[in-house]
């Protein structure tokens, strides 16, 4: 049985509002997270990912409240990332209604945290976010480095090797973002996506750079991704999830079709 590929709208949340920037800067407001999540649920999105891009301790309660409100009205899986640093953070988000949590900086600081989290809560709800930037020259074999803190801090870690290590430690999925492509609408970094997809035994979610519906299909067919994540093309009404799934199905990709997806919302 072929597993359906997933379309996952991503909501970057700052101070309780959805925003979307270009290369993680130049942020603009895209609306209320609860209303947007409800819309995506009705449109047939397979999952929703929330990324708390500020994630300060002072504003943590705001994100918990957002998750609680969304979980009470939306009935597809929710992943929450940003500021997940310890077991208590994971428990708090899961108790608020999240189905999965995304771990990024804390995994780099203390890789064993991923193993502890997977053992405590199960690999199925642990997503390790890998933000990667190409560091090789044009005349060299492609090489990508892991960055943290919203792409501001280099780690010296090889992104492909790091993704493999995270899977070994218990990550159930890898959320792979190309920092070079994020917000550019130039398409996924397919070489990066393929390299990581080939290197890990767990699902890879491709992120960063979607500008057209064809980019989503390319992420699966050329990049080998199990799921594709996008923000701007959906947030600002350029395309609907239903249109994305129709295009992917036309290109031979198995997707989940529900009654709601047959009519655009």
Swiss-Prot record:
Top-level division of the source organism's lineage: Bacteria
Presence of the UniProt keyword Cytoplasm in the record: yes
Database matches in Pfam families: His_biosynth (PF00977)
GO cellular component: cytoplasm
Main location, first listed in the record: cytoplasm
CDD domains assigned: HisF
Residues annotated as catalytic: 12, 131
GO molecular function: imidazoleglycerol-phosphate synthase activity; lyase activity
GO BP term (any one): L-histidine biosynthetic process
SUPFAM superfamilies assigned: Ribulose-phoshate binding barrel
InterPro entries: Aldolase_TIM (IPR013785), His_biosynth (IPR006062), HisF (IPR004651), IGPS_HisA/HisF (IPR050064), RibuloseP-bd_barrel (IPR011060)
Catalysis: reaction(s): 5-[(5-phospho-1-deoxy-D-ribulos-1-ylimino)methylamino]-1-(5-phospho-beta-D-ribosyl)imidazole-4-carboxamide + L-glutamine = D-erythro-1-(imidazol-4-yl)glycerol 3-phosphate + 5-amino-1-(5-phospho-beta-D-ribosyl)imidazole-4-carboxamide + L-glutamate + H(+)
Quaternary data: Heterodimer of HisH and HisF.
Full protein name: Imidazole glycerol phosphate synthase subunit HisF
């Amino acid at each position: 049985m072929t597993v359906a590929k997933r379309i996952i709208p991503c909501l970057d949340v700052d101070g309780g509002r959805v925003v979307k920037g270009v290369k993680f800067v130049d942020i603009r407001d895209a609306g209320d997270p609860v209303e947007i999540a409800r819309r995506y649920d009705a449109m047939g999105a397979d999952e929703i990912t929330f990324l708390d891009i500020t994630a300060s301790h002072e504003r943590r309660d705001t994100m918990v409240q957002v998750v609680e409100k969304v979980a009470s009205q939306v009935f597809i899986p929710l992943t929450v990332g940003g500021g997940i640093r310890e077991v208590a953070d994971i428990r708090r988000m899961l108790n608020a209604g999240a189905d999965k949590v995304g771990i990024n900086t804390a995994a780099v600081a203390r890789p064993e945290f991923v193993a502890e989290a997977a053992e405590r809560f199960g690999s199925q709800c642990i997503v390790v976010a890998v933000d990667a930037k190409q560091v090789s020259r044009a005349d060299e074999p492609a090489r990508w480095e892991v960055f943290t803190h919203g792409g501001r801090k280099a780690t010296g870690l090889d992104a492909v090797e790091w993704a493999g290590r995270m899977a070994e430690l218990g990550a159930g999925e890898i959320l792979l973002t190309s920092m070079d492509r994020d917000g550019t609408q130039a398409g996924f970094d397919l070489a990066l996506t393929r390299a990581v997809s080939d290197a890990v035994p767990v699902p890879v979610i491709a992120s960063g750079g979607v500008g057209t519906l064809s980019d989503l299909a390319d992420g699966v067919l050329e990049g080998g991704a199990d799921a594709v994540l996008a923000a701007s093309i959906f947030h600002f009404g350029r395309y609907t999830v239903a249109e994305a799934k129709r295009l992917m199905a036309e290109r031979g990709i198995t997707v989940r079709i529900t009654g709601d997806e047959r009519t655009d919302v």
